[in-house]
Amino acid sequence: MHPDLGPLWKLLYVLVILCSSVSSDLATYFISEPLSAVQKLGRPVVLHCSAKPVTARISWLHNGKRLDRNTEQIKIHRGTLTILSLNPSLSGCYQCVANNSVGAVVSGPATVSADALADFDSSTMHVITAEKKNTGFIGCRVPESNPKAEVRYKIRGKWLMYSTGNYIILPSGNLQILNVSSKDKGSYKCAAYNPVTSELKVEPAGRKLLVSRPSSDGFHILHPALSQALAVLPHSPVTLECVVSGVPASQVYWLKDGQDCLSGSNWRRLYSHLATASIDPADSGNYSCVVGNNSSGDVKHVTYTVNVLEHASISKGLHDQKVSLGATVRFTCEVHGNPAPNRTWFHNAQPIRPSSRHLTEGSVLKITGVIMEDSGLYQCMADNGIGFMQSTGRLQIEQDSGQRPVIVTAPANVEVTDGDFVTLSCNATGEPVPVIHWYGRHGLITSHPSQVLRSKSRKSHLFRPGDLDPEPVYLIMSQAGSSSLSIQAVTREHAGKYTCEAVNKHGSTQSEAFLTVVPFETNTKAEPVTPSEASQNDERDPRDGSESGLLNLFPVKVHSGGVELPAEKNASVPDAPNILSPPQTHMPDTYTLVWRTGRDGGMPINAYFVKYRKLDDGSGAVGSWHTVRVPGSESELHLTELEPSSLYEVLMVARSAVGEGQPAMLTFRTSKEKMASSKNTQASFPPVGIPKRPVTSEASNSNFGVVLTDSSRHSGVPEAPDRPTISMASETSVYVTWIPRANGGSPITAFKVEYKRMKSSDWLVAAEDIPPSKLSVEVRSLEPGSIYKFRVIVINHYGESFRSSASRPYQVAGFPNRFSNRPITGPHIAYTEAVSDTQIMLKWTYIPSSNNNTPIQGFYIYYRPTDSDNDSDYKRDVVEGSKQWHTIGHLQPETSYDIKMQCFNEGGESEFSNVMICETKVKRVPGASEYPMKELSTPPSSSGNGGNVGPATSPARSSDMLYLIVGCVLGVMVLILLVFIALCLWKSRQQSAIQKYDPPGYLYQGSEINGQMVEYTTLSGTARINGSVHGGFLSKGSLSNGCSHLHHKGPNGVNGILNGTINGGLYSAHTSSLTRTCVEFEHPHHLVNGGAVYTAVPQMDPLECINCRNCRNNNRCFTKTNSPLPVVPVVASYPQDGLEMKPLGVMKFPVCPVSTVPDGGQIPEECLKDSVAPAPTQRTCRQDNTSDINSDSTEDTAEFNRGDSSGHSEAEDKVFSWSPLILSPVLEDCSEKTAWSPPGPPLDGLSVVLQQAQET
């Protein structure tokens, strides 16, 4: 039977309660704190933190701000913080906070950073010479790396990982070669290896080592060339390097502060170097490497200044204290370190800021008038950059009866006119009765009891010479639980926030009120001082024995005579001038500042002071101020020597005898610099007095983010500020920064920021009532993955300004929902192009549906030289998920690269894409022309989501346009060539048809005379020429139509080769018309021996040859429309090789150029006479003008006899074919017909036959 365990369980329960109550009363302390980490982007990071007692709750801080458990990409579970995917926004300082009912403590900072390995400096290959059997030195400038890179060397294609043999890799990364030999010559390349990312980068150029014969040049210190200063951590290994050539290592000596440093120390010799395994702070000092012989005086040395750093430490820390309410507490924290550490105080894990009750004096924190809220845990943290230390102390406060203050009547917001009197009241209750304090924008407001109210005059404070910024005068009247703050003669400087704080030993409470000061619109006279006010003015505190206190509080303008002028007594400082100049100038280096005078305050304006400086709206940097003094009578100032396309800020104030007024502010932008060859004309200025209200649409605004307001409108409303710039504050918040412009003559009272989410048409207020001193505001609670635009509004007493131009779209990092699935399919690289000798541009496509529409966060672009076979040589660029193209920079000229991609999100990376190979361009020669490349831009995704990436819509490149132009030109040329070929073919076919149906002449097959043939052909024009033919077919004139027939006569010895010259026939330039005469060659012996005449005959016009159809020579006429008569080429259409022209006997063939003949067919008798005189009564064959050609024939004959060289050269190369033909001349008007002998008579009897024919 089991015993009853009821009482035992009750006892155990009571013990647990007691233990928990005891543990809850224990102060919290850390068992383990987070450690710094270096990790690759996109990889997870885990931080651990644990504290005692076990009831302590753990929370985390990032860069001093508390992390929410629902923060994207961060997972918090008890004392473990996990960064799921490291990105730049998550890098920084992390601290854990442990708290319980006693208080809270904060851990030391742990830095989380992304790995980094910079590139080697691009340099040319250096040639190094080392002497044989001596020491060689290869220098290496190791690039920056996080963490520190490991140095390796590639020697003649082989890797050297560690010091081996005669190769020593020094801690500085340099390489020392001992006992150099011929086999050591070759190429040496230094490499840096990042142990976190396993990334290896090799020096691009390297060194080339040449080995020479030993020489007697003496000894040299190769490294270091100059004295060095080292700062090292304590207890770390240190090597002081000294590479010497020309002497053995035994002749190298090391001295510390002039004494031998090897005896009795931890230092040892390592070849010619000095090394220690653990250095101590006592080892700090000057170390010298001495080489040479002191006796001979030939000594060389180099010095190291070693500074051993010390971690921060606390020699005297905090201890627990227990005090009563209202007491004063002091915590002491003495720190040491090298360099001197910074000391930071914390109360319950919150930094302590100095106040009236919390004061820091050296190593002491002093708290006066402690209250219950001051109880808890206090920490002193010392940090000097190489280490931190902390000490914790607990403050307990004894409780007694009482009540914390409660404000029952809070001060109200007040709006008053400039110069009026205002009073703010505040009442509070508590036990004990609380004390009430007032705070303004300058801190705690104090008031001496002697201060009294002044008259309610509407004027500003008058300044004495030398008083630049007098403190505003206030009057505080307080009693138990009640207080009032009075301000007389309110000015614009008094506007702002006022805080009422009620404090007793149990705590404090606060209430706020805003004071708004509006300008006084009308001129008023000085109000008289009433007797009561005068009596108040004469009141003095007995403790104040002089009037100096009042004079300091109410300074006045003191003149040389010592009497204040009445006009000055009622005058005030002038108002801000109204700037009329536009915010943009058409000139690149000058600007005309034009203004209008504001109210002068009752005194004339003596001068204007204009200050201007350049602003860099891209980086926020500003230039130095330039100040110009302008006489008060002027209203215009020309600013010169400005920079083109730059933004400038102008501040302008008016000064009178009373003082300087409120400043007017303006920002303007200069225009672009115009090139000398530009043909663009400058836009004309608009006519004065005809204002044009610009369109303030976001789409059409192109004024560099400036909204141009109407220059003729001077209602006092400020101008719209410049386009705001957006920068990331955290994952879900941004900083909106802007630059204000002219204030419209009235001070700016507030700013307002609006935002709009893309795909939404509503503008919402992000922040309002922003003080005018702030030009930046943080907008929180933005939705991850969304795209926003922002704009700014300026407010003064006259109202709101125009809205500024909307900012450029800003996409918040992350996604609305978490996606744990990583993408599988990567992007596809569609195009690569080398845009310069160091840049390659690539485009890609990504189809979300290939990964089930899983959104992606961005792309990884990997690239390495093609000749590399090591995956660690790949470099990586990270690109946003909305991009569709990227330009890889910092590449080597004329080098081929392998390029591949991945897409990634929070779940991981996708598979690799296709690999593209692209080679950079040849390095441009200095001085060669270089054409700017058009900027490629990809419009943001319309969805605002990095995963929904559509096809690229970037504009066409200039190279594509060049290809298009060349293709069009070639196409037009090919088209013209095809048309030309078609025309040639058509022309050829036309000529073939013409030659087929309209031959140049028809040959009649006559009788053979002793085996010889006589050729006849028609002729358009002939002349009486001794042995030559004149008026050939190649003359410039048009050949006359007709039926004229020419009978050729050939002398003995004429063969088939034309050895003579045809003058005036084939190539004659004469133009002639032939007469209708009977022409006969009666002097055949004048022809050149061995020559022959051949003349082409044009066709006859159909109208002239109607009657030729009855001619008995069977010649035919064909119709030819509107074209010159064809000519027969010199060479016959059908040449026959070996054809010989037989000589004929002397014959006379009378020719009668007629169209018709009688039926009898007989030739008239006059046509057969030896005389060649034409018959005047003869009927002609055509109605042409007749002309005597005897003179022409004479000239041509003479020309022929001279032997024209040109005609001769043409004819010599021609072989003429003579077709056998005998033409029977038919004469229209001849009554007789010549009887021809039948073929068959011998050649010798030819003359007899012809003679008989003549006799008949």
From Swiss-Prot:
Residue spans, topological domain Cytoplasmic: 985-1256
Cellular compartment(s): Cell membrane
Transmembrane regions listed in the UniProt entry: 964-984
Tissue: Detected at low levels in stomach, spleen, brain, large intestine and lung.
Induction of its expression: Down-regulated in actively dividing cells. Not detectable in suspension cultures. Accumulates only in cells that are attached to a solid substrate (in vitro).
Cellular-component GO terms for this entry: cell surface; plasma membrane
Signal peptide: 1-24
Pfam annotation, one family: I-set
Polar residues biased stretches: 1177-1192
Name of the protein in question: Cell adhesion molecule-related/down-regulated by oncogenes
Species of provenance: Rattus norvegicus
Encoding gene, per UniProt annotation: Cdon
